[in-house]
Amino acid sequence: MSRFLICSFALVLLYPAGIDMYLVGLPRIAADLNASEAQLHIAFSVYLAGMAAAMLFAGKMADRSGRKPVAIPGSALFIIASVFCSLAETSTLFLAGRFLQGLGAGCCYVVAFAILRDTLDDRRRAKVLSLLNGITCIIPVLAPVLGHLIMLKFPWQSLFWAMAMMGIAVLMLSLFILKETRPASPAASDKPRENSESLLNRFFLSRVVITTLSVSVILTFVNTSPVLLMEIMGFERGEYATIMALTAGVSMTFSFSTPFALGIFKPRTLMITSQVLFLAAGITLAVSPSHAVSLFGITLICAGFSVGFGVAMSQALGPFSLRAGVASSTLGIAQVCGSSLWIWLAAVVGIGAWNMLIGILIACSIVSLLLIMFVAPGRPVAAHEEIHHHA
């Protein structure tokens, strides 16, 4: 079992590493490519667009051909794209490389969640996804630090060579450690069960909405945090970095505590707790009389996301034993596109950073609480399948 957990964690971590590691080198990248930093900030959106594009086909391929046939080319593409970015001499080529990086990371991301659905029952999957969420929270803190250390001795291109090395490690794991987990193709008599795993299932759709809103909350916070903390609250850049490191610490603490909480409380209880924390955070930020209270509200955001997201993802994947790849893709596309759409629309309409965050917190909590209380799971399905090792 440990091989599947190690491979799944490695496959997922390409996604945040591709976002965070290069940011520290952005000024030098812009100077060398004769582009402004503002022009290159679109590289974040281009990367997410690549991920979303990969998710359109990766899930279906993983269900038809297997997990390894998607993980291997996905990690290989991430390696090639990282090298391409390091060799880029214009901003256009650099952005093209970032899109390809997103394609590779998206393939690996989808496969990771499909593997966990294949190999773990509901309760263990919820615990593992909570742990995975905690590990993912470490990357935004460690990646810029690692990038800074690399750039003390080497040019910015070395950041992408470091990403390529990460991709090589994932490729080696996919080739030599990961074993195929896709359930054997169903017999004709099992076709009705395959067809019953509909993406239009009310319970699945409710969890898609909940996880998409939750991701929108956390990405809104990440995107607005420089404005909130430095421009509105007046913190210096060093203080901002310290606060963000502390919020990552809060996220990790609650993520690593959630598996123990699942041994005591029902998953539904933790999901309700998560949304209550979001609601409390929104109210706290709305009425905050001081910076200290506002910072407390921010910690509630991190705690709420960490307590509930892994549980909600596990519940979303639960009904799908034969279509776990497609379900994972659907979740990923909804989360990436939904959160990006909200942030874009709020910016176009002219909603300020503070109100943008408060609005999504309150909307997420109210909608999610209603869905948790009134949309119950359908008929029980097999928690997980026996692993068939394909030649």
UniProtKB/Swiss-Prot annotation:
Main location: membrane
Parts of the chain that traverse the membrane: 4-24, 38-58, 76-96, 99-119, 131-151, 158-178, 203-222, 245-265, 269-289, 293-313, 331-351, 356-376
Keywords: Cell inner membrane, Cell membrane, Membrane, Transmembrane, Transmembrane helix, Transport
InterPro entries in the cross-refs: MFS (IPR011701), MFS_dom (IPR020846), MFS_Efflux_Transporters (IPR050189), MFS_trans_sf (IPR036259), Multidrug-R_MdtL (IPR023697)
Periplasmic side: 25-37, 97-98, 152-157, 223-244, 290-292, 352-355
Residue ranges that the UniProt entry lists as topological domain Cytoplasmic: 1-3, 59-75, 120-130, 179-202, 266-268, 314-330, 377-391
Membrane topology, from the record: Multi-pass membrane protein
Protein's recorded name: Multidrug resistance protein MdtL
Organism (species): Shigella flexneri serotype 5b (strain 8401)
